[in-house]
Structure formats: structure tokens, C-alpha cells
Swiss-Prot record:
GO terms for biological process: intracellular sterol transport. It comes from Aspergillus oryzae (strain ATCC 42149 / RIB 40) (Yellow koji mold). Catalyzes the intermembrane transfer of phosphatidylglycerol and phosphatidylinositol. InterPro entries: Ig_E-set, ML_dom, ML_PG-PI_TP, NPC2-like. This is Phosphatidylglycerol/phosphatidylinositol transfer protein. Optimum temperature is 25-30 degrees Celsius. Its main location: cytoplasm. It is found in: Cytoplasm; Cytoplasmic vesicle; Golgi apparatus. Residues 1-21 form the signal peptide. GO terms for molecular function: phosphatidylcholine binding; phosphatidylinositol binding; phosphatidylserine binding; sterol binding. Belongs to the NPC2 family.
Length: 175
């Protein structure tokens, strides 16, 4: 039960929040509503930034997925481009979380440099523009439902590289 409560609280915290100043209007001010909305990652994808990316080490220009949304049994083509503002060295890591509804399937810390070999890159990564492409064969048997993925990435000094999330990626059962 505690597990489900924690997962629900996390989802509530990650969801876009909409609060109006009028709901806190003690002094009858005419302030306009405060809107805290997630910022989408440019391109054909379901990705959003977890928070304001302006101070991140990675400036993502665009991420394209094909097909979007991903389909079971199909090859997912990923093309991404961006600019690294600093060198990324060994010791960088990713905090990865994958959920199926409210159920956490994966919660792990992964070595970023070990993961980069999957997209034919390796550490150290120098500052500057970069583009990566990757083909991923998705299994035919993905349980139908809504999935949420979040990847929070840090350099070896704990500085924020980027944080991305994909909410409610839905796989439908065969009809």
C-alpha cells in the first residue's frame, strides 16, 4: 500500500500543475492565472522536459521518433540532435524509471558512458553539436496499457545534463 501511495504522489508531482492566483485571492487582486506547464521537447515525439532545461548541459534541438507513437513488433527509428555545453566524462549517470500505470517496472541508476555504446558513441564526449540515430526493434508482445518513462541525466560532478519524461505512452492490445 505504501508503494502505491508513493507512486501516486510521484505522478501527481510530475503532472502539469495548473493553479490560479484567483484561488488564493485574499486581497481581491486582478492577477492573471499562474500556469506551470511542461515544456515539450521539439520534434515528432511524446517527450517533455522534467523541468526548465535552460541551465542543462545538453541543449536538445530536436528528437524525432518514427513511428510516433511506437508500435509493438515494429522498428522504432530515433533521430536526435543537440549541443553539449561541456565535456561529458566517465562517471556520468542516468536515473531511469519506467512505470506501467502506477506500477514501477524499472528504477535504476545506469552508467551513461556504458549506455552510449548502444548508440555508437563513447566517453568522453566533447562539447559541440551532435546527432545520433538509432533503430530499436520493439517486441510484438508488449502488454497493453499506459507506460511512463523518465530519464534524469547527470555528469560525474552531479551537474544536470538533462531530464526527459514521456507520459502515458499507450500500447493497445490486438483487436
Amino acid at each position: 500500500m505504501k508503494f502505491l501511495s508513493t507512486a501516486a504522489a510521484l505522478l501527481v508531482c510530475l503532472a502539469p500543475v495548473s493553479t490560479t492566483a484567483r484561488s488564493l485571492d485574499f486581497f481581491k487582486s486582478s492577477q492573471s492565472p499562474i500556469q506551470a506547464q511542461a515544456k515539450s521537447v521539439p520534434g515528432n515525439n511524446p517527450l517533455e522536459y522534467c523541468n526548465d532545461p535552460s541551465g542543462d548541459i545538453l541543449d536538445i534541438k530536436q528528437v524525432d521518433l518514427s513511428p510516433n507513437p511506437p508500435l509493438p513488433g515494429k522498428t522504432l527509428a530515433i533521430t536526435a540532435s543537440g549541443t553539449l555545453r561541456e565535456k561529458i566524462e566517465d562517471g556520468a549517470y542516468v536515473l531511469l524509471e519506467v512505470k506501467y500505470g502506477l506500477i514501477t517496472l524499472v528504477r535504476q541508476t545506469a552508467d551513461l558512458c556504458e549506455q552510449l555504446v548502444n548508440v555508437e558513441l563513447k566517453c568522453p564526449l566533447g562539447p559541440g553539436d551532435m546527432t545520433l540515430t538509432k533503430q530499436v526493434d520493439l517486441p510484438k508482445q508488449i502488454p497493453p496499457g499506459k507506460y511512463t518513462v523518465q530519464a534524469d541525466v547527470f555528469n560525474s560532478d552531479g551537474e544536470h545534463i538533462t531530464c526527459l519524461k514521456a507520459l502515458n505512452i499507450e500500447f493497445k492490445g490486438p483487436f
